[in-house]
Amino acid sequence: MTRIQASGRSVLDVIRTRRSIPRMKPDPIPREVIEQLLDAAVWAPNHWMTEPWQFFVLEGEAKRCFAEMRRAVHRARLPDPDSPQAQNALEIAYRATLNTPVIIVVTSRVAEDPEVREEDFWATFGAAYAFMLGAWSMGIGTYFRSGALR
C-alpha cells in the first residue's frame, strides 16, 4: 500500500477515483490504520451471514516467505525459468514484493453448497473492495491481484 493525497472525499469520489497502484512506496502503514480498514471491510454484505473472509496481514518474515512463495509459483509457470531474462524478471518481482510495506492476503472459506459458495465468493470480494475503498479514502493506495478463482 502507498500513501496518496486525499482528504474529505465523498464516497462517490472515492469509488470513481480509486485505482490500483502497482508500485508501492516503502512508507510503513500504521497498525491502527490497518485495523480500522479491516474493521470496515468486515461490514461487507453477506446474504448467508457466513462471514467467509479471512484477512492475513503480512509484514517482516511473513512477507519475505510470501515473496519467495510467489517467486516459486511464477518460476514454475515460465517456459525457460533459468534464462537471464526470466531470472531478472523474477528478481524484480521478488524485490517489489519485499518493498511493499504490508501485504494483505484475503481468502474465503469454501462452502460445500454451491449456492453458499458463490455467495461467499462475492461477499469476500466485497470485503476486499471495501478495504481498498477505505484505504483510498485515507490516502493509501492498494493493488488488487488474484490467483485462480475457482
Predicted regions and their residues:
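N-terminal amphipathic, basic helical "cap/leader" segment at the start of enzyme domains
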Residues: 1-99
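Short, conserved beta-strand edge motifs with alternating hydrophobic and charged residues
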Residues: 56-58, 104-107
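Generic beta-strand or strand-like secondary-structure segments
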Residues: 65, 92, 103-106, 130
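Small-aliphatic-rich amphipathic alpha-helix that forms the alpha element of a beta-alpha
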Residues: 41, 104, 110-150
